[in-house]
């Protein structure tokens, strides 16, 4: 099993475990322990923090991936690593002064619809600092071709942390204020672990000078910062805008729906952790055939696996929400079923593009990205204002679908016109037909059992049929090899 397949496999396991724990948090503990209003407050605070984080990191984690393999010497690589640690301080320190000097005004602005938020907005700044440096040290490990530990910390750790804190809150061991403070401490413990791990993998020598190509690094970081800020707005602006435009409970409904649909994104997040450094190396070494292979394989494999998740979620959506009602005792969540479908379509389109985004970001055409991201961010804000007014909180998901689809189409066109390669092939057509066929077939199939039994039964049928078609049509040799390896290991275990 190659480095991409092996680490992607372990990363997918981490992501799926994270989603399982997150599902328990989102569906059971948050509604029962805190209720919809306090849960909505946590969602809004973390969403605001995620918007601030790209400003603090200033794109240096992506600069590290793009330029480390192109550095002419170990000394220049070490300087680049230290550069990546120092640049964020240029933005964090002044922001800290402005944030806390104007704390009252910022709190008043952010809490117009939700007054309870005002006393906790310090979380926004502190979590943003922690996540900014976490991403830098995590990418430090990624350029050493080690993604599994960092991915576990990124995906699983924080959800286990929240589970423990919610249990403590449910048992009245802590109040909401202590929950917020403990959450911050937990994020900084995670930062300490990834810092220690990345330095254990490789500790750079300290040089009291910046890299020779500092101007080039700053230019790239600035453009990626603008791009990441726009992308962060697209991802997190929904929760932030909904927090000002609708009641807290609708933010909670929306968040649960987003969480469900995000499961489709698990393979993308897992595979691209290791693919991104490989893309950068292929571009820096001008290995066109290797780049073409990475794009083609990532597009096919991600669409195959994400397509299975798409069918599992959306063909089971009614039983899934019945099960959520059984666990949470809250019947309002079902109002967000259309959100699941809209965001699911967004995720499946993104999966089909493979590592297109990584190619654009790591190529000489990266200067297109900030304009696309900022344009998309502006578009999603205006579309949110329009569609939330017309469709309620569901309108935010529809706006996201429109913007992300357009964003992906443009990036595919950029790669197609500049590198003369595309993530699509005849396998893409087979997969689209397979996904649509299974979705429509199993959506109309109902069993007269409990929601839990229906989920197990229908999911088993979907997996068996979908994977049988994929193997029979030989859509992906990589997936076929993984399934064959898993089958052999299972047979050896069972004797």
Question: Which stretches of residues belong to each language-model region?
Answer:
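Helix-loop junctions and terminal segments of transmembrane helices
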Residues: 56-72, 143, 257, 261-299, ...
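Membrane-interface junctions at transmembrane-helix termini in multi-pass inner-membrane proteins
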Residues: 130-156, 341-375, 415-417
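Transmembrane helical elements of multi-pass membrane transporters/channels
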Residues: 7-23, 182-190, 194-198, 211-281, ...
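Interfacial segments at transmembrane-helix termini and the short loops linking adjacent helices
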Residues: 103-124, 313-347
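Hydrophobic alpha-helical transmembrane segments
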Residues: 153-200, 374-379, 393-414, 437, ...
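Signature of the first transmembrane helix
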Residues: 3-62, 91-96, 100, 127, ...
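Membrane-proximal transmembrane or re-entrant/amphipathic helices at the cytosolic face
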Residues: 443-495
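Interhelical loop/hinge segments that connect adjacent transmembrane helices in multipass membrane
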Residues: 1-4, 116, 176-182, 192-235, ...
């Amino acid at each position: 099993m190659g480095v991409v397949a092996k680490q992607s496999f372990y990363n997918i396991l981490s992501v799926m475990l994270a989603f399982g724990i997150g599902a328990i948090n989102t569906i059971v503990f948050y509604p029962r322990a805190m209720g919809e209003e306090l849960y909505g407050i946590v969602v809004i605070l973390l969403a605001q923090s995620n918007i601030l984080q790209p400003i603090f990191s200033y794109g240096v984690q992506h600069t590290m991936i793009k330029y480390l393999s192109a550095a002419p010497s170990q000394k220049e690589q070490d300087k680049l690593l230290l550069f990546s640690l120092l640049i964020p301080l240029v933005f964090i320190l002044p922001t800290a002064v402005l944030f806390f000097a104007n704390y009252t005004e910022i709190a008043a602005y952010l809490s117009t619809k939700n007054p309870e938020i005002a006393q906790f907005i310090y979380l926004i700044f502190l979590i943003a600092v922690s996540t900014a440096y976490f991403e830098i040290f995590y990418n430090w490990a990624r350029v050493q071709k080690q993604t599994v530990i960092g991915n576990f910390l990124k995906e699983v750790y924080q959800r286990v942390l929240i589970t423990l804190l919610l249990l403590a809150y449910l048992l009245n061991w802590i109040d909401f204020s202590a929950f917020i403070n403990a959450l911050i401490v937990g994020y900084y413990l995670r930062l300490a672990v990834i810092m220690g791990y990345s330095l254990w993998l490789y500790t750079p020598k300290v040089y009291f000078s910046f890299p020779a190509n500092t101007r080039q690094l700053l230019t790239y970081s600035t453009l990626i910062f603008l791009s990441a800020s726009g992308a962060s707005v697209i991802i997190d602006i929904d929760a932030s805008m909904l927090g000002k435009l609708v009641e807290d409970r609708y933010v909670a409904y929306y968040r649960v729906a987003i969480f469900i649909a995000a499961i489709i994104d698990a393979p993308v997040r897992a595979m691209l952790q290791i693919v991104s450094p490989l893309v950068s190396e292929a571009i820096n070494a001008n290995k066109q055939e290797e780049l073409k292979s990475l794009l083609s394989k990532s597009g096919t494999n991600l669409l195959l696996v994400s397509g299975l998740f798409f069918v599992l979620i959306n063909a089971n959506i009614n039983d899934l929400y019945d099960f959520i009602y059984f666990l949470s005792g809250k019947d309002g969540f079902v109002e967000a079923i259309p959100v699941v479908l809209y965001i699911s379509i967004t995720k499946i389109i993104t999966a089909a593009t493979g590592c297109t985004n990584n190619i654009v970001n790591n190529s000489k055409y990266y200067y297109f990205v900030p304009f696309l991201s900022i344009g998309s961010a502006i578009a999603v804000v205006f579309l949110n204002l329009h569609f939330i007014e017309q469709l309620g909180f569901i309108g935010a998901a529809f706006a996201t679908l429109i913007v992300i689809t357009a964003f992906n189409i443009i990036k595919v066109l950029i790669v197609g016109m500049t590198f003369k390669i595309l993530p699509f092939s005849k396998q893409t057509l087979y997969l689209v037909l397979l996904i649509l066929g299974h979705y429509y077939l199993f959506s109309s199939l109902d069993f007269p059992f409990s929601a839990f039994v229906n989920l197990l039964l229908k999911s088993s049928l979907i997996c068996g049929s979908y994977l049988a078609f994929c193997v029979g049509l030989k859509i992906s040799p990589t997936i076929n090899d993984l399934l064959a390896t898993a089958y052999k290991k299972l047979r050896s275990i069972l004797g």
